[in-house]
């Protein structure tokens, strides 16, 4: 085991290099670190370590376990590591002052600062995110982004039992609330001692900007309401998203839908997602264009995308807000029984929108994906939701990120796809493959045996996985991309002028 003083010196050195602290802070920081290890003396160490940031942090955690300061449990180790890094962080007020000082230079300067801080403080778990499998694969709609999510570690049985028997608390109310800023964490609530938020004003309300601890794309940020209020999509949503992109034109912003099945995993707290990433949907081609009376300054088109989407372009924020709101209101009450689209059943609302906003070539671009969450006997999880035949790949809600063409697929697929590759190489029998994958594996075998001499196995499986993800998205499209669906889509866009 490494010497504690040498590890403390190394962490201080790394934090200086990452601009978390300055030379003047060395003694203070060292003493605070000694304190949490219950040490009251320090001897300079001749040994100079060259460990990486995460290696150093992990060795410090091992010493804390050895000294019985913490339990050898994931939640306890995470809480302790956040407490360590919190020592290196300024208070929220100082971080906000620095953010806006840099914002006066440029919006990108301010987000670069906050993003770097969030990584250097280990709030963004770059070590765990690096475990994800990411690749791009072609499809009939363009190149798709595929991620097999391996970043979130699984809890062990002991931890699960502790969580089950723990006293429930309503503080913080949810994972997004402002009360998470600096929160110690428990066995049931993640560590947030090293968590900081930037205060924003959007549409005369206070919002918070933070980064996701488990990024799915570059600079994946969350914009959350100061108040714990439920998700909703209305005119204020469009005002907020456009206001955010106006303030940070290098970022996009979007919202999950506000209804179950088609919404995100957190419906209890109003929030948006954003970041500095170009999604496959951004490059979708025009399907047809149309116009809306009274909005001559707004370009309108439907795009060629598996989830039925209207794209608006314009320079005037007010016009885009009103045009988006008109489309939302029309869609809320729109039904087309020939396509299984019903806006209400037994007074339950089914229609909503997943909106995304970005700035491109001096114009704002608003993408409005039309969603419907109705269920049926044939499709009890949702008519416009991944159907049973694709559940072996993805059965969860299709939220904002997936709508835009980035698949976030379960970690189990890593080993399962390797088995399928072994089967395609004739190394194992079909019986060795999970039962829910077998129909797909048989289908792939026929294709691969035909193409074997002309294709790489990994590329082949990646492309087929991308095609399966496209099927997931197509199931969610309310207007299918066939003659009947296209006519239905045009009926809806025509109704915008009625």
From Swiss-Prot:
- What Gene Ontology terms describe what this protein does at the molecular function level? UDP-glucose:hexose-1-phosphate uridylyltransferase activity
Query: From its record, what is one biological process in GO terms?
Result: galactose metabolic process
What pathway annotation does it carry? Carbohydrate metabolism; galactose metabolism
Which catalysed reactions does the entry list for this protein?
alpha-D-galactose 1-phosphate + UDP-alpha-D-glucose = alpha-D-glucose 1-phosphate + UDP-alpha-D-galactose
* PROSITE patterns, per database record: GAL_P_UDP_TRANSF_II (PS01163)
- Give the EC number(s) under which this enzyme is classified: 2.7.7.12
In which compartments does the protein localize?
Cytoplasm
Listed InterPro entries? GalP_uridyl_Trfase_II (IPR000766), GalP_uridyl_Trfase_II_CS (IPR023425), GalP_Utransf_C (IPR005850), GalP_Utransf_N (IPR005849)
Its chief place of residence is cytoplasm
Highest taxon, organism lineage = Bacteria
Any one GO cellular component localisation term in the record: cytoplasm
Signal peptide location: none
Q: Which Pfam families match?
A: GalP_UDP_tr_C, GalP_UDP_transf
Report whether Transport shows up as a keyword of the record.
no
Q: Which UniProt keywords apply?
A: Carbohydrate metabolism, Cytoplasm, Galactose metabolism, Nucleotidyltransferase, Transferase
Under NCBIfam families, the record lists: PRK05270.1-2 (NF003629)
Record family assignment:
Belongs to the galactose-1-phosphate uridylyltransferase type 2 family.
What protein am I looking at? Galactose-1-phosphate uridylyltransferase
Give the source lineage, highest ranks first. Answer: Bacteria, Bacillati, Bacillota, Clostridia, Eubacteriales
């Amino acid at each position: 085991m490494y010497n504690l003083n040498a590890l403390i010196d190394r962490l201080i050195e790394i934090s200086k290099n990452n601009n978390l602290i300055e030379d003047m802070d060395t003694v203070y920081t060292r003493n605070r670190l000694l304190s949490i290890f219950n040490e009251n003396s320090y001897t300079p160490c001749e040994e100079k370590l060259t460990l990486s940031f995460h290696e150093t942090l992990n060795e410090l955690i091992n010493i804390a376990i050895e000294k019985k300061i913490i339990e050898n449990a994931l939640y306890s180790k995470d809480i302790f590591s956040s407490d360590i890094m919190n020592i290196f962080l300024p208070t929220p007020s100082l971080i906000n002052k620095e953010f806006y000082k840099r914002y006066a230079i440029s919006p990108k300067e301010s987000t670069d600062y906050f993003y770097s801080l969030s990584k250097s403080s280990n709030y963004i778990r770059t070590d765990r995110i690096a475990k994800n499998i990411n690749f791009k694969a072609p499809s009939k709609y363009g190149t798709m982004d595929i991620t097999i999510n391996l970043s979130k570690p699984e809890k062990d049985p002991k931890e699960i039992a502790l969580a089950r028997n723990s006293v429930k608390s309503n503080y913080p109310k949810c994972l997004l609330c402002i009360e998470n800023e600096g929160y110690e964490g428990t066995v049931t609530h993640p560590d947030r001692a090293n968590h900081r938020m930037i205060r924003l004003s959007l549409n005369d309300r206070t919002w918070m900007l933070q980064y996701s601890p488990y990024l799915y794309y570059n600079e994946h940020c969350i914009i959350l309401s100061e108040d714990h209020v439920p998700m909703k999509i209305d005119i204020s949503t469009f005002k907020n998203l456009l206001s955010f992109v106006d303030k940070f034109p290098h970022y996009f912003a979007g919202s999950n839908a506000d209804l179950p099945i088609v919404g995100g995993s957190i419906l209890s707290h109003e929030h948006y997602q954003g970041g500095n990433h170009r999604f496959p949907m951004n490059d979708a081609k025009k399907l047809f264009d149309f116009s809306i009376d009274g909005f001559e300054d707004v370009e309108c088109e439907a795009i060629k995308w598996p989830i039925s989407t209207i794209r608006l372009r314009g320079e005037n924020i007010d016009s885009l807000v009103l045009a988006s709101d008109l489309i939302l209101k029309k869609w809320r009450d729109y039904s087309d029984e020939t396509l299984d689209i019903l806006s209400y059943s037994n007074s339950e609302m089914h229609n909503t929108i997943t909106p995304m906003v970005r700035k491109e070539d001096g114009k704002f671009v608003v993408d409005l994906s039309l969603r419907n969450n109705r269920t049926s006997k044939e499709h009890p999880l949702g008519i416009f939701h991944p159907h049973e035949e694709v559940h072996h790949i993805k059965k969860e809600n299709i939220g904002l990120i997936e709508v835009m063409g980035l698949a976030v697929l379960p970690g189990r697929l890593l080993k399962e796809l390797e088995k399928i590759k072994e089967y395609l190489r004739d190394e194992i029998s079909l019986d060795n493959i999970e039962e829910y994958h077998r129909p797909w594996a048989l289908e792939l075998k026929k294709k691969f045996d035909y193409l074997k001499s002309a294709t790489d196995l990994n590329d082949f499986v990646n492309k087929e996985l991308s095609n399966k993800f496209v099927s997931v998205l197509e199931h969610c499209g309310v207007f299918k991309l066939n003659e009947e669906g296209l006519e239905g889509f045009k009926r809806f866009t025509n109704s915008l002028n009625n």
